[in-house]
Amino acid sequence: MMNIVLARIDDRFIHGQILTRWIKVHAADRIIVVSDDIAQDEMRKTLILSVAPSNVKASAVSVSKMAKAFHSPRYEGVTAMLLFENPSDIVSLIEAGVPIKTVNVGGMRFENHRRQITKSVSVTEQDIKAFETLSDKGVKLELRQLPSDASEDFVQILRNVTK
């Protein structure tokens, strides 16, 4: 089985903080963007993967392909950082048999149909339900931009703003 060292929601995907901070702290040798939408959109996929450094393998795959790869002997010993666009994809991945115990909530951009709940996180009703599902499944949800930042309990933040 693959070794998942970080599961992070960050809709910027591969960017400076990922490349200079997170990847070093977790010593990942592979970055995997897990998104059904991006896996099917060749243009977005190419743009996202083009910024990965040459010393780190990067790929963008669907949720089902990630579940298969996780259990494949081919990826035994791979140390991977998983990047997600939203919490619903993580729920789907867990339900497909991939054990994720902690999710780092990094950034979800503001748009008109989203509610801003922190400086860096804006959510839809679907996102809120998915975060609640993750919490109900025992997944720890932490808000943290950088590895050096203090970890904040994202479930508590979500509860405080959605009362």
From Swiss-Prot:
Q: What EC number(s) has UniProt assigned to this enzyme?
A: 2.7.1.202
Q: Which GO CC annotations does the UniProt entry carry?
A: cytoplasm
Q: Residues in the active site?
A: H15
Entry's Gene Ontology molecular function annotations: kinase activity; protein-N(PI)-phosphohistidine-sugar phosphotransferase activity
Keyword Transferase belongs to the record? yes
The stated induction of this gene product is:
By fructose and LevR.
Stored CDD domains:
PTS_IIB_man
InterPro entries, per the entry: PTS_IIB_sorbose-sp, PTS_IIB_sorbose-sp_sf, PTS_IIB_sorbose-sp_subgr
Residues that the record marks as modified (Phosphohistidine) are H15
Cite the PTS EIIB type-4 domain residue spans from the record.
Answer: 1-163
Q: Which domain of life is it from?
A: Bacteria
Give its localization. Answer: Cytoplasm
Q: Which GO terms describe its biological process?
A: phosphoenolpyruvate-dependent sugar phosphotransferase system
Coiled-coil portions: none
Q: Which UniProt keywords apply?
A: Cytoplasm, Kinase, Phosphoprotein, Phosphotransferase system, Sugar transport, Transferase, Transport
Residue ranges crossing the lipid bilayer per the database entry: none
What does the record give as the reaction this protein catalyses? D-fructose(out) + N(pros)-phospho-L-histidyl-[protein] = D-fructose 1-phosphate(in) + L-histidyl-[protein]
The function of this protein is:
The phosphoenolpyruvate-dependent sugar phosphotransferase system (sugar PTS), a major carbohydrate active -transport system, catalyzes the phosphorylation of incoming sugar substrates concomitantly with their translocation across the cell membrane. The enzyme II LevDE PTS system is involved in fructose transport.
UniProt free text on domains: The PTS EIIB type-4 domain is phosphorylated by phospho-EIIA on a histidyl residue. Then, it transfers the phosphoryl group to the sugar substrate concomitantly with the sugar uptake processed by the PTS EIIC type-4 domain.
NCBIfam families, per database record: pts-sorbose
State the protein's name: PTS system fructose-specific EIIB component
Origin organism of this chain? Bacillus subtilis (strain 168)
The uppermost taxa in this organism's lineage are: Bacteria, Bacillati, Bacillota, Bacilli, Bacillales
Gene (UniProt) = levE
